[in-house]
Amino acid sequence: MRFFCFGMLLPFTFVLANEGLQLPLETYITLSPEYQAAPQVGFTHNQNQDLAIVGNHNDFILDYKYYRSNGGALTCKNLLISENIGNVFFEKNVCPNSGGAIYAAQNCTISKNQNYAFTTNLVSDNPTATAGSLLGGALFAINCSITNNLGQGTFVDNLALNKGGALYTETNLSIKDNKGPIIIKQNRALNSDSLGGGIYSGNSLNIEGNSGAIQITSNSSGSGGGIFSTQTLTISSNKKLIEISENSAFANNYGSNFNPGGGGLTTTFCTILNNREGVLFNNNQSQSNGGAIHAKSIIIKENGPVYFLNNTATRGGALLNLSAGSGNGSFILSADNGDIIFNNNTASKHALNPPYRNAIHSTPNMNLQIGARPGYRVLFYDPIEHELPSSFPILFNFETGHTGTVLFSGEHVHQNFTDEMNFFSYLRNTSELRQGVLAVEDGAGLACYKFFQRGGTLLLGQGAVITTAGTIPTPSSTPTTVGSTITLNHIAIDLPSILSFQAQAPKIWIYPTKTGSTYTEDSNPTITISGTLTLRNSNNEDPYDSLDLSHSLEKVPLLYIVDVAAQKINSSQLDLSTLNSGEHYGYQGIWSTYWVETTTITNPTSLLGANTKHKLLYANWSPLGYRPHPERRGEFITNALWQSAYTALAGLHSLSSWDEEKGHAASLQGIGLLVHQKDKNGFKGFRSHMTGYSATTEATSSQSPNFSLGFAQFFSKAKEHESQNSTSSHHYFSGMCIENTLFKEWIRLSVSLAYMFTSEHTHTMYQGLLEGNSQGSFHNHTLAGALSCVFLPQPHGESLQIYPFITALAIRGNLAAFQESGDHAREFSLHRPLTDVSLPVGIRASWKNHHRVPLVWLTEISYRSTLYRQDPELHSKLLISQGTWTTQATPVTYNALGIKVKNTMQVFPKVTLSLDYSADISSSTLSHYLNVASRMRF
């Protein structure tokens, strides 16, 4: 329902700026709907009176309102919009000063509402006017709080001339603890020096604890296209994605008090902290500084993934530190719960066409710190410009827990973008690697004035460049390389990238001096290379699962050193012996390394040819087999044959039913089995549980052997120790048993035979250095047999009987070949089936009670020794590397102790119930068997 209020009606028409769209406006000076019966002129445009819009169950709509001063629809001192179940809409309202829809002289609170929307509101009936404040296209307030709303909040197509295309607050704005999403889209502030296309806050803006997604998109202004917050901006503890995209800061008119920029946002202190689903800055534009963010200080920590994609500016494609005001700027980027990614951000300050790729541009004395926690990365597919003087060193992996990776890569640079600026990060001050990994890959380069490796690993991939650069003592001075030094003490080579097609060896280079178009050797810098040289992959893991290492390799280029005639690169302490030391998984082999040194004549027209000393480190590889990572070894798959064997033996137990009475009988049994296989000899054990049912028929007579036939179906689950690997199985069992007595019933002989088909699904979860999961389906076949001999005493009528027995058990299991899917997928096929022949020997005692309810108690104790065993083995192959190995099962002890207790109760003349428990105990295995059976004779 729409609420229309009566009052004085004045026709009015205005032209929406830059749209050419004429909208008829009706001017209302009205009351809130509840006061329509007794209107008070001017109540809704009184800056000294509070106003509340609360508890509406129907839609509340104020549209096409105009007021001659502030607040096109409402003007008040404090405004509360709360607990409205119906939608709240402010649409197409206009005023010539501030607050196109709402003007709150002090505070505005929007809380606990369902959907609320501010659309197509405007300040100024004349878009060319410059007089007046012209602030807040939708809303003006000294302080504003948008909190605890349940539905969607929408601020779309609002327009102001100076500040706050949609929202303007003189001091603080809080967007906090909202359950529904918030959309701030296509709002504009039009003047050339306007601020905050979507939001303007005169002091602080907090976006915290929201459960719904926040979208700030397609807004524009002179500076701070999406957001302008004068002092602080905090985006923290939000549960859904925060998106700041497609915003534009169009001003390029610098002034003494105007330094425009920030296509996405502009502020002094920006904190982006603990946002679970991450933050996205995409396709924001600035005609001046900082395509995504223009801020003096930025802290990005403890978030999910943070993306800076496709942003563009004149300086600082993604980020630029604001140089105005007192104090020094600092950028702290820490990938703690997700990666931080810079890709396809561009800048144009050097008037390149097309613009060159750039992630960060620094102004003087910026403090830049970049790091990543284990398993996470800060990925720079765009270079950094840290050229202006700073007393603060750039710190890579600056905190104790930063053992992750900071990567510079040219992987995504278009093949036509050949200019060096698309690949090189210029670090013209001091840089330090504290710990973790600093990786340079795919043609990217670090040009450093001073670089010190205090710890961690410098990982170099194909085409990577580490080179010298001059420093700039003052912003207006010429770069100088005097004092330039690079110290490296632990280099790793990304071997898979070096082995890729047309790969180039990573290069350590003293960059030549350029005068005009002439290049000459630069003898000022020094480079020291020492410590160990190791081989890794791009994830800083052993690279030996590469398929290339399955065969011999010759003349693999590992490292290229480009020195000057004065020999300013010292690599004499580089230790190459570590290439063949230590253990690793994957392909095994031996590296043979050698240097090739060349002295050339300087070529002043060639950037690379200007230097005259060239050294290339080559290596040859001789393979010697394959060793799988323990998580890939796969004994859990082989152990499936043992799990099926235990289940088949449980099925055999259900076939034998010794009964002195003759006739026919049928039984229905519920069966359970719990097996605990211990770890042994470095192989992981497992824990499995099985439940199922069995149906058997029996025929007994005094003239012929007893015969029983049974069918069973079992369901089992198994889990490997110390991992999340699991198997679900479905077993189909059938068997028969023949019993007869010999030597005047002194000996009872029984023969049991069984076959079981098992369908299995396995799920492997990788942890530690390996991540991901794989799954596969397979089946196996199990044959089981038992030959049992029981020595029966005479006479039968005794209530207590004790007699020995001996049994021969045989098991054989086969597994069909199968292939996994997913991460680290493997292929398995049978190498040797499981074969086990054992001999349980023991004593059985039975006691009969012929009272009111006849009972029979049976106990057994036995010792089982294995006569012959062939442990199962599988042929295993890692598909990604084609590495092969043999997978064994977890060892099972050859001897075990067996205990059994069974109680049979005759509940009716022809019906018995029984409960049977048995356990097998050994140093490797503990199993518990339980059988509940009901048997009827015919």
Swiss-Prot record:
Pfam families per the UniProt record, alphabetical: Autotransporter (PF03797), Chlam_PMP (PF02415), ChlamPMP_M (PF07548)
Compartments it resides in: Secreted, Cell wall; Cell outer membrane
Main location: secreted
Domain Autotransporter: from-to ranges: 659-938
Keyword Transferase: no
Key words, A-Z: Cell outer membrane, Cell wall, Membrane, Secreted, Signal, Transmembrane, Transmembrane beta strand
Gene3D superfamilies named among the record's database cross-references: Autotransporter beta-domain
Keyword Transcription regulation (UniProt): no
Cellular component GO terms held in the UniProt record: cell outer membrane; extracellular region
Membrane topology: Peripheral membrane protein
Record's signal peptide: 1-17
Similarity remark: Belongs to the PMP outer membrane protein family.
Protein name: Probable outer membrane protein pmp15
Taxonomic source organism: Chlamydia pneumoniae
GN (gene name): pmp15
